[in-house]
Amino acid sequence: MAYTQTATTSALLDTVRGNNSLVNDLAKRRLYDTAVEEFNARDRRPKVNFSKVISEEQTLIATRAYPEFQITFYNTQNAVHSLAGGLRSLELEYLMMQIPYGSLTYDIGGNFASHLFKGRAYVHCCMPNLDVRDIMRHEGQKDSIELYLSRLERGGKTVPNFQKEAFDRYAEIPEDAVCHNTFQTCEHQPMQQSGRVYAIALHSIYDIPADEFGAALLRKNVHTCYAAFHFSENLLLEDSYVNLDEINACFSRDGDKLTFSFASESTLNYCHSYSNILKYVCKTYFPASNREVYMKEFLVTRVNTWFCKFSRIDTFLLYKGVAHKSVDSEQFYTAMEDAWHYKKTLAMCNSERILLEDSSSVNYWFPKMRDMVIVPLFDISLETSKRTRKEVLVSKDFVFTVLNHIRTYQAKALTYANVLSFVESIRSRVIINGVTARSEWDVDKSLLQSLSMTFYLHTKLAVLKDDLLISKFSLGSKTVCQHVWDEISLAFGNAFPSVKERLLNRKLIRVAGDALEIRVPDLYVTFHDRLVTEYKASVDMPALDIRKKMEETEVMYNALSELSVLRESDKFDVDVFSQMCKSLEVDPMTAAKVIVADMSNESGLTLTFERPTEANVALALQDQEKASEGALVVTSREVEEPSMKGSMARGELQLAGLAGDHPESSYSKNEEIESLEQFHMATADSLIRKQMSSIVYTGPIKVQQMKNFIDSLVASLSAAVSNLVKILKDTAAIDLETRQKFGVLDVASRKWLIKPTAKSHAWGVVETHARKYHVALLEYDEQGVVTCDDWRRVAVSSESVVYSDMAKLRTLRRLLRNGEPHVSSAKVVLVDGVPGCGKTKEILSRVNFDEDLILVPGKQAAEMIRRRANSSGIIVATKDNVKTVDSFMMNFGKSTRCQFKRLFIDEGLMLHTGCVNFLVAMSLCEIAYVYGDTQQIPYINRVSGFPYPAHFAKLEVDEVETRRTTLRCPADVTHYLNRRYEGFVMSTSSVKKSVSQEMVGGAAVINPISKPSHGKILTFTQSDKEALLSRGYSDVHTVHEVQGETYSDVSLVRLTPTPVSIIAGDSPHVLVALSRHTCSLKYYTVVMDPLVSIIRDLEKLSSYLSDMYKVDAGTQXQLQIDSVFKGSNLFVAAPKTGDISDMQFYYDKCLPGNSTMMNNFDAVTMRLTDISLNVKDCILDMSKSVAAPKDQIKPLIPMVRTAAEMPRQTGLLENLVAMIKRNFNAPELSGIIDIENTASLVVDKFFDSYLLKEKRKPNKNVSLFSRESLNRWLEKQEQVTIGQLADFDFVDLPAVDQYRHMIKAQPKQKLDTSIQTEYPALQTIVYHSKKISAIFGPLFSELTRQLLDSVDSSRFLFFTRKTPAQIEDFFGDLDSHVPMDVLELDISKYDKSQNEFHCAVEYEIWRRLGFEDFLGEVWKQGHRKTTLKDYTAGIKTCIWYQRKSGDVTTFIGNTVIIAACLASMLPMEKIIKGAFCGDDSLLYFPKGCEFPDVQHSANLMWNFEAKLFKKQYGYFCGRYVIHHDRGCIVYYDPLKLISKLGAKHIKDWEHLEEFRRSLCDVAVSLNNCAYYTQLDDAVWEVHKTAPPGSFVYKSLVKYLSDKVLFRSLFIDGSSC
């Protein structure tokens, strides 16, 4: 018993926790059924097509306003006021939804064409021609009917059944459908109409007098009238101009004339009577007779349209208790006219009536008055001396925000100008991460000046009241009025007497507080209406007759009871079944009995449907004669030319081959260019081919190959789409490997159910709520994928080729002629070369980039070819003549060049043979060279089930050339190559033994700790690659991915113990794997395989055999004669010539457009306009969003126009934008790194590369923290800094992780044209307090001194406190006769890109130099997670790592990091010279050195966005390093110098002289014009538009050397 109780309790707990699978499955099933029911209910909503083009926001407005409809937005028709026009159809359908179907309905002023299209034969439209525009509108409706009928006729169709009755009615008796009388005079007489009569008035009651409306309705015996009209509550406030923002329309009123018009477009206006509309809005009762009245009730307001209904009321039905005896005053006074005294009694008797009374009240809410206040504005006319005072509604929050802020101003700062400036600035909106951090107050800009004056006067009065209160109302000799004028006179200054006189004369200002009173308005206004009628008779309330409907329901209920015995009968839709039976005139009971008998095999009758659905059951017993009327007639038609769009519309994507019995002639192709947009929202079924193995190809072999290639794209596209559909159908059941390739987005929750590894997929497959699957072109916004309302899920694939396959299919199908591809007559030459034979080098030597084209399979190969071709500095290889195969096909016809003389295809045998044939034909070349390797990996057909016969894999060529000498492979690999190739393979490599293997105990043994990576890591399979990447290895690729690449050392890894088909003795993958290295290859494997046997055989290869494959390649030498003079620069004094215009011309040529930028008020514009920002976690004090006003000193104005900006004022917005663009914009590029071990290896490389061997160990006898080191540090500090340390006892450490943040007021100039398109962010400074700097400053100063003393100064320059002359001395021994590669590493966001790895490298360097462990750990923690506080701007945030720009180690730390970064990537043992300074570097290597992919390594290891440039001359720290045959000269960048001459921050003439002296110090070398020619070349290397600049260099020397002349470059700003 105890066991049973325990088991029961355990099972119950499992169920509660969700561990009971049975309960979970039931819950999921219940959730699924609920979702299906909900979606089915949505599908049953009326469907409305919205054809007009509207924006996404307007789409949302329409959808939310009318949830009763299922709206489909086609966006196919541009029109005026498209939203309002499109809403008309929704409004009409909403009104018609209120009316029982089939009841006689009068549409007052309606659109009879709309009712015809909907098949409403029970609607009569009263459409009077009140003006010419009405006639035009009626003719337009007739045109729409004619257009509809002509379309049907052109398509060979007839009017559908549901429209037939309405169209017949209009054709035979048009006056029954529409008349042209007013509703009050309509003569339409219904024929045998039973039931109630209804009316609708869609935007038409404006023109019907309100007093006649009730009588007109009663005349037509209307039971209920539904109306819709545009209105705004603000019209009740007697506003003369009211906006309807949602439909972009407006009302304007002039007296009783009310005009309605649409804004931002040229359309006709509508004029109505304001008083008449007001009656419809405010009245409740509309009398129709002495007995009946129509009562109005508002229903809803949707998109600026008010809906109401007028219900017919019989006053005789009123409860008798409301009747009372009273005197009819009109009858009384009429009788009194006849007799006053004698007939008084008779008059009283005659005037007695029984009256019925009722009353109503309507509240109108004014939403715009909520949180608003009424503010007075003052104005005066100078011509008429007439003063005016008006009141406006302004946001309460806005008013008191302004008043509270300016109330804090000091007396001198409280001026009208400062108040106006603040009001302008806070009107703009600040959005942080999509959330409004500072609200935007919708205040009319034209009111800001008047409001500012009111706020200013209000504050002045408040200041006075405070003074009076403080003095306890003791005013002395001055009156209250005099106090006010004293305050105003302080603000207006000398202008006060005239101002005071004018204000007094006009009585503009009153001292009393009520003149400046700010009041709160009412939110509601109530309108009353009263009904008085005479009691004459009494009747009973009639009941509604629903007997007929109940009888029909009983029949349907009995029929469904019969059907309930069938399987899946619970899924029958009763509404659909009843409608089908009614429309087909089938008895439901009979249909049900026959179906049950047939399904139970009791009737001996077989019906034609497969499943008993609602429609099939009704169709089963439809009358044969009526069924034949709607039968589908199959007719023969001519064979069409199939297009992409047509194919998908028919549910198929055609093949180029012959499938089944289809004739070949049916597969032709038209010449139109089809867009990829045609694929958007195509059904997935239209792209999936389920059977492709029976395709037959005809024609020559090349044609067959080309057709097969087209079909392979179709098959690939089909497989990709099919896989995504499968993922959508079974998201939860896919395995881990599949999860790594796909992604599934749940649209409702905006979350990834399966997160993809890649981002920004161009295409995907969409699952709708109706469980339909479509291929969709994906778009993105700040929230991710842009989705539609009917989307349920979106699937994407990292391996998906949907986009490229679609683009290539579009191109290739366009090239077909009558369904046949065109074969080029060009000569095709196959260049068959062994691995490493120099195929790419040969291509570069043979190609003429002006007339030839190079195509490669991969993007990296294309970039490599361009890089190698442009290595000389001259750009010859571009994206126009070096392309990938996919790019060439996808963008065919878009390039300026369409014909090439010769075509070079690198690794062409990796492509489909049909693809190669297409490339030759598309290039229109005379001869095509296909470079490849017949023994390496060929084209692989990756679509299972797609036929790719063996004879298709052989490329048809005219000639074959062989290359059998490898420049890469060592001797042992060359021995293996001789087994695989025909002919004798030779090698130029000096390496004899290169391959080895190691059997490992299991896959877990392979990790970065026990098996650190050596060289390039390769795998055979993608799964092994992903496993290695997950364990911490970087830069891992498969063998197939690196075909054609070369590496010094290779580590080949196999983790899969199961058999792998591509690892075989004759496998091309094995050949590629063995031939990638130049020095060594080591194979790590968990099992014995054929590759192990091959490597073991090669390990045993004798030296005698390896020497047989060697080819000696000698080196040619040339006799060199050194210059006679070395070590000193030739000096030629530069002549002082030129003018200001020379500098301006040179600047405009180098940076075109920069000088035209009017950026003086950019900062003001940003502060006064709306701004939307996205930030990381931070705390903002919005009270600091507007800085306190300061006195502005006008700076000197430069005569040279550059992109220099005015100094910025610090504040929340400026500081926050700077922080976003810098501190919050750190890249995340790095891969998985073993930080400690990798940092240790990097530091080893750093010490080995830069430090002298004898000084690589720290001197432990020297104390870092001593009195001498502190004194040396203090000597470099300013007195202010030392004063801050006066109260510091050095006993305890302050918070090392706390930093302050500030910005430099002057933006940094960039020597590019980015200023024309972006707002430059200010440079941020993050710094410690001086107390922390006093502790660590001396330490790092001493560490820096020791580091610089240990550096090999003959080869490396760490630019710290060096002069230009010292730089020239360092580079002076460069030999210009020795070919050199000058390298520069350009890194963007250098400081902010530094992360934990950089910190680890830097700390390890300091540790090895002798940094004490405890302080080192403190310093490390102070740079890990740090807090930034900006007290000026009111910002507080937290950042991880990053270089602190105001730290004691900022400069030397950056210099050390850039040096360590380069040492880890480049062969520093070969370097000639190297210089490092902050994030700048300049390296000189011997010509021809091979360098790794620096950009790739910098991204993955160092998190740097880096580019490595090869140049002729170096550029270092803003200076050009010009090496020549006598030494080296360093020129300051002349363009940078000119940019500084446009500075806008020079305060006065003394400041200008200091500025000139600093420029003279840095530009002294320009006095030597001996090397101006080389300087021109160096500048042109950076700025391609720069002209020869000797004229401007001389002009700079002229102005910099003359103090008086230099002053002419600026003018006094205060005088302007």
UniProtKB/Swiss-Prot annotation:
Segments forming domain Alphavirus-like MT: 72-281
InterPro entries: (+)RNA_virus_helicase_core_dom, Alphavirus-like_MT_dom, DNA/RNA_pol_sf, P-loop_NTPase, RNA-dep_RNA_pol_alsuvir, RNA-dir_pol_PSvirus, ToMV_Hel_N, Virgaviridae_RdRp
Sequence segments annotated as region (Helicase): 830-1085
Swiss-Prot/TrEMBL keywords: ATP-binding, Helicase, Host-virus interaction, Hydrolase, Inhibition of host innate immune response by virus, Nucleotide-binding, Nucleotidyltransferase, RNA suppression of termination, RNA-directed RNA polymerase, Suppressor of RNA silencing, Transferase, Viral immunoevasion, Viral RNA replication
Domain (+)RNA virus helicase C-terminal: 964-1116
Domain (+)RNA virus helicase ATP-binding, residue spans: 801-963
Note: This protein is translated as a fusion protein by episodic readthrough of a termination codon. When readthrough of the amber terminator codon TAG occurs between the codons for Gln-1116 and Gln-1118, this results in the addition of the RdRp region to the replicase.
Protein name: Replicase large subunit
Organism per entry: Tobacco mosaic virus (strain B935A) (TMV)
